[in-house]
Amino acid sequence: IDPMNILGIIMPEKESDPESELLGEEIAKQLEIQTQKIDITSILESFGVYEKKEKIVKEKFPDFDKNCKYRVAIPSKFSSSIGIPFLEILDDKGKTQKFKISTTEFLELTAASSIKHRVRMTMLYYYAEKNNFCVVGTTNKTEFLQGYFVKYGDGGTDIEPLTKLYKSQIYQIGKFLKIPQKIMKKNASPDVWSFKTSDEEFFYSVP
């Protein structure tokens, strides 16, 4: 495919990892792919995404402010702990604290976070239709088999070329394409929490 027929949409927001934006721009430049950056913070604010999540966070940690970061995680893989999700907060002094959350709180936190995926999908389709392009997904075989994608979010695509490939095979392709090591070694993440979270910390672990 001619790089001129590919458009990469970079969608930062106030809780996303700035490194993701930089790496996205770097790989697009290497592959000679044109990009467009749209900050979706104001859109998410209009849905009350941050307000909904921070309400629960502040109930657990009243001192929470803009200098703190937070995420929902599960016990480390293959530990003896029951896999019950918890809220983890990184305060402005670099100290982490964990808090129990109810099923209702967990569902509300993840539901609000899923809005981020769906806003991203909406923006992708706007630019796809505007340019007569199709939306390409990045779900791999492990994610597809486990259902690790958001319905009408990152699962809302026209084609999914990677669902026949395990992540190990995708790394082989990345090596063949000479993708920078800092991208290859970066933990896969949904990038919906202000406190960095990998797929394994948030959703699943496999041997």
Residue ranges and their predicted role:
Residues 1-139:
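ATP-dependent adenylation/nucleotidyltransferase module used to activate substrates
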Residues 137-207:
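Mid-to-C-terminal catalytic subdomains of enzymes
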